[in-house]
Design a protein with these regions (language model features):
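Short, surface-exposed "cap/lid" segments of acyl-processing enzymes
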Residues: 1-88
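Active-site-adjacent structural elements in folded domains
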Residues: 16-18, 64-66, 89-94, 207-208, ...
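Alpha/beta-hydrolase fold nucleophile elbow
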Residues: 107-127
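Alpha/beta-hydrolase-fold enzymes
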Residues: 112, 116, 130, 134-238
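Conserved alpha/beta-hydrolase "acid-adjacent" motif
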Residues: 281-287
Length: 293
């Protein structure tokens, strides 16, 4: 695969992810970063951001002018962002339930630190699916500690045709599960390669022409640096996400059990706001719209 970005132009902590913050909680699966307020007064209710497990947290803090963290801080919000641990084959057993339990601990930590009775959450991609499942679990327990949830490019209802689904059948999904079972993890670069082939003109041949035919350096583009700075998924979570895609259980009340409770998304009382990208080839806006419904 041709390089999409000049990696020498970026470094986390130098020109990426530079908003001041500290790790205030840690468990086996995640670190919780609390960012320093930029206003004299802050809102009581904090916001907790849940990134996708296959990518790194600093997509929400790329640069001062492209930083959700800085925007929320300047808006007077107490801001926390999760950084997921990069698993190895020793953590192959980590599944959706384990990630939700870890997220529950992070929620408890945020509430304990801020003294707030509840919080708002923002989840992106698989992080949004994880956050939604947690809210379903809370709803089953009668727990209202999440006031509002924002979902960014998160698919809860997989009953929609996408470019990705055109290449996927049971045989392909079973083969993917076998591969991650053997390795213990799914390498992020393998998943990125699959997604790139969904838009080959933009994400492959464009760079082939630029890098090899024209002899130019790859461009300096912060979001592409982040997109290429992948992590791994443990086999357990990979298998669960495949079955969510295949069986679409979140659509049917009680079809999915999380942490010992059946999930019914209709019982969630938190306000939910869904965001989609009009040109997103991985999570088309129609899929996010179905989730909102």
């Amino acid at each position: 695969m041709p390089s999409q970005v000049n990696k020498a132009a970026f470094e986390v902590g130098r020109n990426l992810g530079i908003t001041p913050g500290s790790v205030v909680f840690r468990n086996e699966l995640l670190e919780l970063i609390q960012y320093q307020p930029t206003t004299e007064q802050v809102h009581t209710r904090p916001v907790l951001v849940v990134p996708p497990q296959i990518n790194k947290f600093y997509v929400f803090d790329l640069s001062p002018d492209k930083s959700l963290a800085r925007f929320t801080l300047d808006s007077g919000l107490q801001t926390f962002i999760i950084s997921w641990r990069n698993p190895t084959r020793q953590q192959s057993h980590w599944d959706l339930n384990r990630y939700i339990e870890a997220l529950k601990e992070a929620v408890d930590a945020v509430l304990a630190i801020t003294g707030s009775a509840d919080l708002n959450m923002l989840g992106a991609c698989s992080g949004g699916v994880t956050a939604t499942a947690l809210l379903g679990h809370y709803a089953a327990l009668g727990d209202q500690r999440v006031k509002a949830l924002t979902l960014m490019v998160s698919v809860l209802d997989t009953d929609v045709d996408t470019q990705y689904s055109l290449f996927v059948d049971d045989k392909t999904l079973d083969a993917a599960k076998r591969r991650s079972s053997e390795a213990g993890v799914l390498e992020g670069r393998d998943l990125a390669r699959v997604f790139a082939w969904l838009r080959p003109n933009d994400l492959i041949w464009n760079y082939w022409v630029n890098n090899y035919l024209l002899g130019n350096l790859p461009p300096e583009f912060d979001i592409l640096y982040w997109n290429n700075d992948t992590t791994r998924l443990p086999a357990g979570l990979h298998h669960d996400l495949i079955e969510l895609f295949r069986q679409n259980p979140l659509r049917t009340p009680g079809a999915l059990e999380v942490c010992g409770t059946p999930i019914d998304l209709k019982t969630i009382e938190a306000e939910i706001f869904c965001v989609a990208g009009t040109t997103d080839h991985i999570t088309p806006w129609q899929a996010s719209y179905n989730s909102a419904r």
